[in-house]
């Protein structure tokens, strides 16, 4: 059968676990400080949502109303070593006077946590393999217990290295949001040139990915050229401009868009009721930066 599948993707291998403190900046957006990389991440267990979903029956409908509790993701992280960043910055442990030991305090730290999963996909058009990353961000992650471990005596069969298992939970963040909505987790996928730019930025200085982070090589919308028009009748506010419902992106794809028309003062205007003047049309689509196009309306002669 000839079916139009998407590009085929696989993900494998965790790396670059970063923890950071997050505060709200003066512009309301997250600001990150005290970035540290944690060495020795082996795996991240399933972060399951513990919130209950309840259906309330009425009449002859079993789900007259449905309510979901607050999101609480719980899971675990496994490490093959526990370095200072893990002990101090996540578990809140206290270092001994001689600098050789650590003791638990129960004062677990809440951090913004990010890690990468390597990926590879085969482009559906060219057939080429493209490398990339899945970037996983938990804006508000906290341990729920001290890290546990098991050790065994060496034998003729050898012995496995000790692994530490850390129980964690993630909740909504009041600061880190997507489209104005609070989120307990976000996963980004970056490929090709964007992945290369991401790695370059990360190597020059640790950072946390955000919904508005711009990377070089992004696929963008191509702004249209909107023809100038005149009003339908002289002296009336009845101008109509041609506003496309789809735009091309920088790779030639056709993308459905929404649009908003604003006058020179930034006030939203209604197509078909446009007065003579200059207007800016803003086009939006999920996964793309907005683009704008200018157009003028003149009075009918």
UniProtKB/Swiss-Prot annotation:
It comes from the Viruses. InterPro entries: L_lac_phage_MSP, L_lac_phage_MSP_N, Phage_tube_C. GO terms for cellular component: virus tail, tube. One of its GO terms (biological process) is symbiont genome ejection through host cell envelope, long flexible tail mechanism. Keywords: Viral genome ejection through host cell envelope, Viral long flexible tail ejection system, Viral penetration into host cytoplasm, Viral tail protein, Viral tail tube protein, Virion, Virus entry into host cell. It is found in: Virion. Forms the cylindrical rigid tail tube with a 4 nm wide central channel for DNA ejection. The tube is composed of 31 hexameric rings. The C-terminus probably makes protruding decorations on the whole length of the tail tube. Homohexamer. Interacts with the tail terminator protein. Belongs to the skunalikevirus tail tube protein family. This is Tail tube protein. It comes from Lactococcus phage SK1 (Lactococcus lactis bacteriophage SK1).
């Amino acid at each position: 059968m000839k079916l139009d599948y998407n590009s085929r993707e696989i993900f494998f291998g965790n790396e670059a676990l970063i923890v950071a403190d997050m505060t709200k900046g003066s512009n309301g957006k997250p600001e990150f400080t005290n970035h540290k990389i944690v060495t020795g991440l082996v795996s991240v267990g399933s972060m399951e949502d513990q919130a209950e979903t309840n259906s309330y029956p009425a009449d002859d409908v079993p789900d007259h109303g449905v309510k979901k509790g607050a999101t609480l993701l719980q899971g675990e992280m496994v490490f093959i070593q526990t370095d200072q960043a893990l002990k101090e910055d996540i578990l809140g442990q206290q270092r001994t006077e001689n600098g050789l030991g650590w003791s638990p305090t129960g004062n677990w730290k809440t951090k913004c946590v990010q890690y990468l999963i390597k990926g590879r996909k085969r482009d559906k058009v060219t057939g080429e393999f493209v490398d990339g990353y899945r970037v996983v961000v938990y804006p508000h992650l906290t341990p729920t217990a001290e890290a546990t471990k098991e050790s065994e005596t060496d034998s003729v069969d050898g012995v496995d290295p000790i692994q530490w298992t850390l129980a964690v939970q993630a909740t909504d963040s009041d600061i880190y949001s997507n489209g104005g909505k609070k989120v307990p987790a976000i996963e980004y996928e970056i490929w090709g040139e964007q992945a290369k730019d991401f790695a370059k930025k990360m190597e020059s200085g640790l950072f946390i990915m955000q919904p508005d982070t711009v990377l070089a090589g992004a696929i963008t919308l191509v702004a249209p050229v909107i023809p100038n028009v005149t009003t339908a009748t002289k002296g009336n506010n009845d101008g109509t401009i041609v506003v496309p419902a789809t735009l091309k992106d920088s790779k030639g794809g056709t993308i459905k868009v929404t649009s908003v028309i604003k006058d020179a003062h930034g006030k939203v205007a209604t197509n078909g009721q446009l007065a003579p003047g200059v207007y800016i049309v803003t086009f939006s689509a999920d996964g793309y930066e907005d683009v704008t196009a200018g157009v003028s309306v003149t009075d009918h002669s």
